[in-house]
């Protein structure tokens, strides 16, 4: 059983591409248009964001070295703060993984409507999305090697237009176009940078991917830290070079209303055929990242089920070590949410749910930063000041992202935390049939 499972584990390059693919996902293709409302000054926002994202990646890299247990943030929170915060972390992250997939598949299939206009019909779009979601559930059931190979190909395809614009877009870059829209936000310098951060801070969600999937990675103590930092660096370079190039290619007024900035830039430079290729690559990038996020949903639930914090069904695995039942449950839940979003009234509510689910990932990030301070105590050696600085930067990065969120999103995130508290109590009672030990001594640690 163990040797069969080891044979299905993945190496450094596929897991690095999974990290970068999960980070960039679908958002990279809309970033230039989103940042156009601020202008070229967004470059400063990128610099701040990249510092924070690298800090967070270093936190996860060090944590995965100190504790290579599968589950990522869940494993760290449970070890350092006990089963309650471990349970809370896992539920939040598990929800974020599969809810985010629903928004991502809509964007990916939407890009395919460039080739198949029938996909613009809401019913056809929804049915296609459900089919695509199940394809990636089934690919995950085949095994982690299969899904990381698929995502590696998808990430490479997605990188074609991104790297193409990042490298060759500069031949069509015009400094006057870029500087003419240096700051069109109507805010001062600090305010403009803050408005940029509200967009860019979210662009590195997924930095934890390798640590969550440590259970299916070869030599996780070595490969997970390298893949984490490497994936962030790949995403950072692609983000900055490509978005900056496009902001100097397309006039700000046109860029603000662009539904496909990369496609528009490619058409401007090389014609309609190039635009079609970019649309295909964008669809591949969006849909390919579904595989990685579905993998994480299955692995984080399995890690919690192995510890008794999730129902045992999530821990059932096949010969390849794949949590088949847990993945099928995720597939059913994604199908229900996808079908419910077909209603125009439900679409708005689902948009709120998607935004809240992104905040769900920030709570595990914060717990991981705190866990490093605890678990790393006495293990940093002479690098202690450096790690304290890095952890502080990562912590502030997460706090700033929460502050930049909408009030309604933060409120519903807090409500979810309260519901999870009650769920933990019910789960505890399910696992422990004896009365709660009222005379248990209070720990003085």
Curated annotation (Swiss-Prot):
Effect on the protein upon substituting residue 205 to A: About wild-type affinity for Arg and Agm
Induction profile: By acidic conditions, a monocistronic operon (at protein level).
Coiled-coil stretches: none
Annotated site residues (Middle gate) in this chain: 293
Result of knocking out the encoding gene: Loss of arginine-dependent acid resistance. No coupled transport of arginine and agmatine. No effect on levels of AdiA.
One Pfam family linked to the record: AA_permease_2
Reaction catalysis annotation: agmatine(in) + L-arginine(out) = agmatine(out) + L-arginine(in)
pH dependence of function: Optimum pH is 2.5 for Arg-Agm exchange.
Site positions (Cytoplasmic (distal) gate): 93, 208, 365
Residue numbers on the Periplasmic membrane side: 25-40, 114-123, 172-188, 248-272, 344-346, 405-408
GO CC aspect terms: plasma membrane
PANTHER family referenced in this protein's UniProt entry, alphabetically: AMINO ACID TRANSPORTER-RELATED (PTHR42770), ARGININE_AGMATINE ANTIPORTER (PTHR42770:SF18)
Function: Major component of the acid-resistance (AR) system allowing enteric pathogens to survive the acidic environment in the stomach. Exchanges extracellular arginine for its intracellular decarboxylation product agmatine (Agm) thereby expelling intracellular protons. Probably undergoes several conformational states in order to translocate the substrate across the membrane; keeps the substrate accessible to only 1 side of the membrane at a time by opening and closing 3 membrane-internal gates.
UniProt protein name: Arginine/agmatine antiporter
Protein's organism: Escherichia coli (strain K12)
Gene name in the database record: adiC
């Amino acid at each position: 059983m163990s040797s069969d499972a080891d044979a299905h584990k993945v190496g450094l390059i596929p897991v690095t591409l999974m990290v970068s693919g999960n980070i960039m996902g679908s958002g990279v293709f809309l970033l230039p248009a989103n940042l156009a409302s601020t202008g070229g000054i967004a470059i400063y926002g990128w610099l701040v964001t990249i510092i924070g994202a690298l800090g967070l990646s270093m936190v996860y890299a060090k944590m995965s070295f100190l504790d290579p247990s599968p589950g990522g943030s869940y494993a760290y929170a449970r070890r350092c703060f006990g089963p309650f915060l471990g349970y809370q972390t896992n539920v939040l992250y598990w929800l974020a993984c599969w809810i985010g997939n629903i928004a991502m598949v809509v964007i990916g299939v939407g890009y395919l409507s460039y080739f198949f206009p029938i996909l613009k019909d809401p019913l056809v779009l929804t049915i296609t999305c459900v089919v695509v979601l199940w394809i990636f559930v089934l690919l995950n059931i085949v095994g982690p090697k299969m899904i990381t190979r698929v995502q590696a190909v998808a990430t490479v395809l997605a990188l074609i237009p991104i790297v193409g614009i990042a490298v060759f877009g500069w031949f069509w870059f015009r400094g006057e176009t870029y500087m003419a829209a240096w700051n069109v936000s109507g805010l001062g310098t600090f305010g403009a940078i803050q408005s940029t951060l509200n967009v860019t801070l979210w662009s590195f969600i997924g930095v934890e991917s390798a640590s969550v999937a440590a259970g299916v990675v070869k030599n996780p103590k070595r490969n997970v830290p390298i893949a984490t930092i490497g994936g962030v660096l790949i995403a950072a370079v692609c983000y900055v070079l490509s978005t900056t190039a496009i902001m100097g290619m397309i006039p700000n007024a046109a860029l603000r209303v662009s539904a496909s900035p990369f496609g528009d830039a490619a058409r401007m430079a090389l014609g309609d055929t190039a635009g079609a290729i970019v649309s295909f690559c964008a669809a591949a990038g969006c849909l390919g990242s579904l595989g990685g996020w579905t993998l994480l949903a299955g692995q984080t639930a399995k890690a919690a089920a192995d510890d008794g914090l999730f129902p045992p069904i999530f821990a059932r695995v096949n010969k390849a070590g794949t949590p088949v039942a847990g993945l099928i449950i995720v597939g059913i839940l994604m199908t229900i949410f996808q079908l419910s979003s077909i209603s125009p009234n439900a679409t708005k509510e689902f948009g709120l749910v998607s935004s809240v689910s992104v905040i769900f990932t920030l709570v595990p990030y914060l717990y991981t930063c705190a866990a490093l301070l605890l678990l790393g105590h006495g293990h940093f050696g002479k690098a202690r000041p450096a790690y304290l600085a890095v952890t502080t930067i990562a912590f502030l990065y997460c706090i700033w992202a929460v502050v930049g969120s909408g009030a309604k999103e933060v409120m519903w995130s807090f409500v979810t935390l309260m519901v999870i508290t009650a769920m933990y109590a019910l789960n505890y009672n399910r696992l422990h049939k004896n009365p709660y030990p009222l005379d248990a001594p209070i720990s003085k640690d």
